[in-house]
Amino acid sequence: MGRYSVSPVPKCLLLMFLGWSGLKYYQVNAAQLREYRLAAQLEDWDYNPQPEELSRLSESDLTFKKIVYREYELDFKQEKPRDELSGLLGPTLRGEVGDSLIIYFKNFATQPVSIHPQSAVYNKWSEGSSYSDGTSDVERLDDAVPPGQSFKYVWNITAEIGPKKADPPCLTYAYYSHVNMVRDFNSGLIGALLICKEGSLNADGAQKFFNREYVLMFSVFDESKNWYRKPSLQYTINGFANGTLPDVQACAYDHISWHLIGMSSSPEIFSVHFNGQTLEQNHYKVSTINLVGGASVTANMSVSRTGKWLISSLVAKHLQAGMYGYLNIKDCGNPDTLTRKLSFRERRRIMKWEYFIAAEEITWDYAPEIPSSVDRRYKAQYLDNFSNFIGKKYKKAVFRQYEDSNFTKPTYAIWPKERGILGPVIKAKVRDTVTIVFKNLASRPYSIYVHGVSVSKDAEGAVYPSDPKENITHGKAVEPGQVYTYKWTVLDTDEPTVKDSECITKLYHSAVDMTRDIASGLIGPPLVCKRKALSIRGVQNKADVEQHAVFAVFDENKSWYLEDNIKKYCSNPSSVKKDDPKFYKSNVMYTLNGYASDRTEVWGFHQSEVVEWHLTSVGTVDEIVPVHLSGHTFLSKGKHQDILNLFPMSGESATVTMDNLGTWLLSSWGSCEMSNGMRLRFLDANYDDEDEGNEEEEEDDGDIFADIFNPPEVVIKKEEVPVNFVPDPESDALAKELGLFDDEDNPKQSRSEQTEDDEEQLMIASMLGLRSFKGSVAEEELKHTALALEEDAHASDPRIDSNSAHNSDDIAGRYLRTINRRNKRRYYIAAEEVLWDYSPIGKSQVRSLPAKTTFKKAIFRSYLDDTFQTPSTGGEYEKHLGILGPIIRAEVDDVIEVQFRNLASRPYSLHAHGLLYEKSSEGRSYDDNSPELFKKDDAIMPNGTYTYVWQVPPRSGPTDNTEKCKSWAYYSGVNPEKDIHSGLIGPILICQKGMIDKYNRTIDIREFVLFFMVFDEEKSWYFPKSDKSTCEEKLIGVQSRHTFPAINGIPYQLQGLMMYKDENVHWHLLNMGGPKDVHVVNFHGQTFTEEGREDNQLGVLPLLPGTFASIKMKPSKIGTWLLETEVGENQERGMQALFTVIDKDCKLPMGLASGIIQDSQISASGHVGYWEPKLARLNNTGMFNAWSIIKKEHEHPWIQIDLQRQVVITGIQTQGTVQLLKHSYTVEYFVTYSKDGQNWITFKGRHSKTQMHFEGNSDGTTVKENHIDPPIIARYIRLHPTKFYNTPTFRIELLGCEVEGCSVPLGMESGAIKDSEITASSYKKTWWSSWEPFLARLNLKGRTNAWQPKVNNKDQWLQIDLQHLTKITSIITQGATSMTTSMYVKTFSIHYTDDNSTWKPYLDVRTSMEKVFTGNINSDGHVKHFFNPPILSRFIRIIPKTWNQYIALRIELFGCEVF
């Protein structure tokens, strides 16, 4: 069946399926049945709907043929009325925990379509998705409903998938057609699905706890990929473009639930913003919702300020393309329920903050200092002004602060360099009032618009896209030379939540023309703080240092001053072509605080200092900015991470503890422009205040300098907020009462005084010739200081003893000594060059792959020892890793030692995320002031060897007891982008103590590592330049022939993902792609939670660049399921895989003992005498009852079972034999297996060597059972005896189940099917015995142990009532013996029904006639038949056709419950 094609279903199968009335009349035991009648229908859609009188005059060019979901009345004749606001969206489906959703679906369109939910419990015939899952054709009728046909989908909302404790009342998901994700979405087939907590919905389906709820879908429709193609790209909200979304209505003091969906068939991000409002999302206060295409979020908002407010995505291209609408808040007379009454003490803490800010035009130098280490190409492209480029200096407008309303005295005589281009920091806590007196000293209108606070229209300072000129008030656009006062109060609804940082990072900017104003430079950082977060001076109480880092992309081509800059800085202004791609690119400046390159100055912090970083992304950027912190981790939203993702026009607050000495790098992870422009170095230094100036301790100069290696200059500074604060009189009194003004009288804090300690530091600094260093040693400025680095176990020693500085054993020893009982884990890893095939199983089995799929790459490979001669062969647990390097596992407080050998042809290294390491083990090169001795780790030459030593601090591991392991990554850091695209990346798992065994494997955990990556071979070191895409191809957007969306480097067909139903499965998901590589992971049929955040339910997981996510899943549905990205174009091109969930009872005898496996299916390398392979059946009896062989030297005997189909093997039972009191048995053996009989795999399991040796028998009679974990899928199994007693001897049974699942016994043999549920046409009864129907149980013992009818004719039948609709996949039959009479059924047929009245025969697919099954050939053996297609029924009858002597039946049915 083609992936997106609809295979014709044979008529007999369709009749059989339609005859399964259980689907039609299926009764659901649910809290509530919620029924919907949905149709897919054609509709002409206008993205810019005009008023009726205008639409008659002209036909819009933006009318497109779409397929949309619409809701109908009972008979599908009348469409239900719908809200105009919903636009293209299908009806919102909703259900509470315990409910069942029944969707009656009819396809009125011209294409096969389906309905697939992102989150619900469903079975295979309600999935609505087409892929090779091993199900029968009739089970795929839901996959693609043909035009004119109908189908009924049944979805259950169970507690396992419902919102968790910390979730909002309703979680937002999408449903859509999954026949062809790209074309179906772009055609319009999508709607919202709300999964709600029990008791959260009213009778009409509306939420109880909100005044209003709205669903908004921010989407990009590519009409060229619609089923009805028409080239156009539309940026919309609910399908409305250019502000034509009907106004969203609300009343003041409403509590609104927002359900926001992002959708696009290509990678897309959205920064959803509601002007003048704040929202709460996942218990965090936000002003911008970060949304990813393919994912959804739920947020809530309490509104109080009346007016019409802009709703938009702040991604520049979205706003410019018309992705906006309006929220209209009216005064409906509702009482104020949002403002909390304050106590007297709280009222006294209220402050008034007054700022005097001007917009000024300046000449800005993006790179006042250009270090020699700056990339040459980057410098030529962005910083030099030859080739008629502007260069690094531009005329810009900036915000600057003044002392008073005269605007004559700036607060800083010299603007702080570390502040860069940023405006002054505006801080306020809840209930404080902020007044900004703004003077426009520039030459054109500007304003101030602040994110993160609720403001009135007078204080908004923003011009909307649809504002006519006459509506642009003074506050929206302050003319040159004019002054305007913005004033607002931080409301209770703006206050950071309990989970938030003390102060949360926001943004302010001019918004007369947001894009051009920001491009011109008018940006600044406000902070909104909790009630007690700020001192009276505006300093945050719970942080040693606050640091602002704004990652801004200034597109100077959109600046108001472009013409001025061309005239001033271009050598030949008249010849400049502004649309020249090279010229345009040279004017897009990637900066950190306005600096487009690294600087010679280094920011400095004290060892153990807690730094509160306020990180923001601003500017003309349509991609995520991943911020990487080397040597340390951010603590953000309760999670430690060393890459923090910033969405456009949004900010994050993160705490960093300075716990790793050295000079480190804060930079953007991603493109060349980002990594070169958005970067700064900082120094984590040890400064011992207690020892400073201690005259009693004399130190030799040599001792002082031994601890200092080429330190940078130091100016250490604690920032004060220059602001006029005007407390209320009562607040003033309280401040004095609390001693808040005492700092002014503290002589140690005075600028004019200089202590002897200061003088000593100045002396040392002058001796060392130190340069400037930004930090925070003192409360005020100290112009120079020295770094008196105290003795430290992992920083001081190596700098004193150069011989041990790079010795891995010495470094590891120091780590081990710092904490008792530390463990050292050693790995041997090499970089090797290989030919990698992105289609390893064969191109014929996949689609959408380019013609060339094999490329030279470099990969990490594990070895057994430091000789690097014997690779560590991967086993079943490593099968799924694909291109990934070996998993490096460790526990908290361990020391990891990796001996790295570079067997490739170019330099590579090892760089680890999340761990603690010295500079000599960083594996990454930048100007960190380290001596050459500490740079040997940066790049290991071909054939070179280096040992990296990493420490595992507690922050690297799980944060709570529910989290087992936490994932990170390692890769080569010589050139991270090119090295990773070349293939050099692997996972790191840090686990709780006691979770890892001596072989570095986790104990009793089912875990998988998945790396989502679009590999671009043109970015690989090994890609021939001659084969790269041409400029023309890139400009017209031709999909690269050399990109491969894949999971672990394998498109479509990643192997080895198998698990048991209801077991805890841990998935570690990695994304180390560039800023545009955004993936949304969806596991069909399952939901999951993020490790450490089990209070939040997830249906899909956005996986952002640099993200390492560990999630936990408890698979609830057996079968083969699809794992994919929700980004349609990547999914279609290969970013998908299958995972198999098998029943926990998958340990059934496969048929050696019962005889289901025939003699011809058993073979061996040889045998001795009459001990033939066919005798190797568990519990076989007789004189010759086993397989045996005499092992000769240099021979390796084996016995093989051909199962004639691929099955799941989970265990092996073995016996020896006894003959004439002589025991013969196998003591030890290993197993090999194959799917085709040609390619054999040795089972390795958890063994550290090449194969697992199973413990065999200890005598000739006892059965020894061995568990196969992980389970294997194979057709052929071989057992290889290695140790034995007397001779290698086997009697065997294999344990397992069918690959497709749904093959467990239904209860005839076990008694789960009750006697009363087994009936027959008649039964034989004599004076001494009764052969009643309930005796028809497989393997039943006794004198009367089967069913016999009263008479033997073709009208007899045996019937089983399964009590509910059941999927029956196979049957085993058995005869019986009475006295010496052998009785069995030789042929039979099957009938079934759901109502016990209308019976239907099981048909032969080939003939469409009643199928006659071959029965038994003796009275005790088993015969098994599979039903393909399976039977869906409650009642089943076995009708004997022919028999031996008399009719006698013992049976077992196999299958599973349907719902």
Curated annotation (Swiss-Prot):
Q: Where is carbohydrate linked to this protein?
A: 156, 242, 300, 385, 406, 471, 557, 943, 1000, 1179, 1396
* Occurrences of domain F5/8 type C (ranges): 1146-1297, 1302-1456
* Sites where the protein binds Ca(2+) 2: 919, 934, 937-938
Q: In which tissues is it expressed?
A: Expressed by the venom gland.
InterPro entries on file:
Cu-oxidase-like_N, Cu_oxidase_CS, Cupredoxin, FA58C, Factor_5/8-like, Galactose-bd-like_sf, Neuropilin_MCO_CoagFactor
Signal peptide range? 1-30
Q: Name one GO biological process term.
A: venom-mediated blood coagulation
Which residues lie in the propeptide? 772-817
Q: What else is known?
A: In contrast to blood coagulation factors that circulate as inactive zymogen in plasma, venom prothrombin activators are always found in the active form in the venom. Hence, catalytic and non-catalytic subunits are found naturally in venom as stable complexes.
According to its UniProt record, which protein family does this protein belong to?
Belongs to the multicopper oxidase family.
The function of this protein is: Snake prothrombin activator that attacks the hemostatic system of prey. This non-catalytic subunit is functionally similar to blood coagulation factor V. It serves as a critical cofactor for the prothrombinase activity of the catalytic subunit, which is similar to the blood coagulation factor X.
What protein does this entry describe? Venom prothrombin activator oscutarin-C non-catalytic subunit
